[in-house]
């Protein structure tokens, strides 16, 4: 759930990220360098209100704070994100893993789990 509306209803964010360990924060940077990693995610806008967009995300890479840093760098901070947003939200961070899937390490069987977000703000806006 992000504040604002992405320019396109679906797309791919491809950025370079630099992790600042003392700050415990990740930044989008313009140039490669020591510690800089490529970060890629695909997104789809599922629903919108006047102020919020409910976004589905598929990570192609899994960097620390990747979703938060990439959306915030585009002035689309996650609702409730006190680290990457200057907005004062009266909610917890609105980042929810709706579905998780992986192959079981012993059996190789595909494992799939899903769960709806809680029925609290901002999820109740949709």
Named regions from a protein language model:
Residues 1-126:
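RNA pseudouridine synthases
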